[in-house]
Each structure stands twice: as structure tokens, then as C-alpha cells.
Amino acid sequence: MPLIPEEPLLASSPDRFCMFPIQYPQIWEMYKKALASFWTAEEVDLSSDTRHWETLTPGERHFITHVLAFFAASDGIVLENLAGRFMKEVQVAEARAFYGFQIAIENIHSEMYSLLLESYIKDSDEKSRLFRAVETNPCVEKKAKWALRWIDGSETFAERLVAFACVEGIFFSGSFCAIFWLKKRGLMPGLTFSNELISRDEGLHCDFACLLYSLLRTKLTEERVKGIVADAVEIEREFVCDALPCALVGMNGDLMSKYIEFVADRLLDALGYDKLYNAQNPFDWMELISLQGKTNFFEKRVGEYQKASVMSSLNGNGATHEFKLDEDF
């Protein structure tokens, strides 16, 4: 049986303790993009949302609360995978820097979703049930179980990398889309603005997974990757079209199903494989957040939440500009 070559990204190295010299400029640039997009939950104004909440239909409220319940739990699952496995496995300092910052951002997402639920739900029993949705809600539990099985499983790093790209790229897609639909209708400004920031972050995290995958020497077979992606698509479709139908917020389930397939095709393309569904984007207004890689959505700097000084420090090769104190003023 031929030996499988060791992956440079995973090969133990004392260099992992020092940030410089940068080994992978493209990873360093991703890290800097993540830094430039830092935001906090305190920067999201929820003052108008309570008034809007009272005008929503019971179906709309049900949809929003259960989407938020899934989001609140899923960020914790992503965190557990990053801290428990990926951070220990990846040995490249700049990749570990990205994961370290992603952990901080996922904590902010988790705080944001929890704040939204706190703000909207006044009944303490219902609030408790939603915060424990992984145990109390079958449709949330199914998605969570699929993600959790990859944390403790014996699958290769490549398989788990693809699976968590699906968690962040596909499992959030239908819900992100539905919340953007609310924005299109002029509803819930705090929720929809936080959704813009979070969907941008998750798009970058998904891009990072695709970048790391491209740097692996041993790739998965097309059949294996498409199997993982198709699994995720079916679970997301069931979640947002059946168990928690997007019709509750006035969206067409068939179009939503097509949108999920479209997002999955984009992910497959980013991973270097052929499309599975050949689906078109049925929601032209979602072009900006189709999680397509280095998106124009990211470059638009949603709400100007990109720290210009961080990005200007990059000069194309991962190095930083020289800082001088002897300039003439």
C-alpha cells in the first residue's frame, strides 16, 4: 500500500510558534481581511426592532426565532471544531492566526444571536427552549448532529474541511437569504444589519476553507466531495423548505430550494470540482451575498465595517509597509 504523503499544512513544525516569515502570503491576506472586518455586537442598533417585531405575523416570528436558535447553537459547534481540532491540526502560523481570529468572531456572532433572542422573546420558558434548540427542536437537532459528527469522527482533515465549509456555506444560506428578504421588505433593521455583517464573515470563513483545501496535496475524489455537499443540501432544504418553511416569511419554497443548490454549486466550483445541480440564482437581489469567494459583497465594506488601515498594510506579498518617524510634516 503506497504511503500517503504528509500534508505541509499539517506537518509538525517549530515555525508554528513564530508568525514571521510568512510561508503562505494568500493565507496571510485572508487573515488581514478578517482583521479588517472586525465588529462588535454593541455596534448594532436594535432600538427599532422591538417595534417592528410587534407588527410581524405569528408565522414570521416563528421563522425568525427558530432561525436564530439554530444560528446561536451552530456558532458554538463551529467554535468547538476550531478549538478542538483544526487549531491543533494545522501547523502553519498564519493559518492558525486566521482560526484564532475566527474563534473571536464566532463568539461575537453567538453573542449577537443571543442578544437578538433576548430582545425579541420576553417569555422566559420560550427563551430557554430556544437557547436549547439543539435538544428541543428536531429540525435544529438534525443540522447540529450532522455538523457534530465531523468533529469527533475519524475522517481525514480534507473531508472535515469540506464538511465545515458546507456548514458555513450551505447550512446558513437559506436562513441568510430569508433574513435578507425581510430587509428587502424594510423590516427588522437591527436583525438585517447584523445578518449582513455575519453573512460577510461566514463567506470569508468559507473562502478560507476553500483556500486551505486548494493547498492540500491529497484531494478527495469528486464523488466523495459531491456526496458531502449533497448531504448538506438535503438537510438545509428540509430545514428551510419543510421543517421551518420559508413560506412563513412570504418566500417561495421551490425558489429557495434552487437557491440552496446554486450556493452548493458555487462551493463546489470554489473547491475545484464540477457543479452538481447547474442551478441559476433565482434571487437576483441575493447576488451580493452568494458566498462566491472573494465577493464584491466583501469589497463593498458593508456598513463601512472594514478597517482601512489594516488592509493598506498589505503590499501584495504578505509583507507590511515600513513605518517611519522621520517624514517631513
Curated annotation (Swiss-Prot):
One of its GO terms (cellular component) is cytoplasm. Fe cation 2 binds at residues 106, 168, 202, 205. Fe cation 1 binds at residues 75, 106, 109. GO terms for biological process: deoxyribonucleotide biosynthetic process. Pfam families: Ribonuc_red_sm. Keywords: Cytoplasm, Deoxyribonucleotide synthesis, Iron, Metal-binding, Oxidoreductase. InterPro entries: Ferritin-like_SF, RNR-like, RNR_small, RNR_small_AS, RNR_small_fam. It is an enzyme of class 1 (oxidoreductase). Induction: Maximum level of expression in mid-S phase. Binds 2 iron ions per subunit. The keyword Glycosyltransferase does not apply. The active site is at 113. GO terms for molecular function: metal ion binding; ribonucleoside-diphosphate reductase activity, thioredoxin disulfide as acceptor. Belongs to the ribonucleoside diphosphate reductase small chain family. Heterodimer of a large and a small chain. This is Ribonucleoside-diphosphate reductase small chain. It comes from Nicotiana tabacum (Common tobacco).
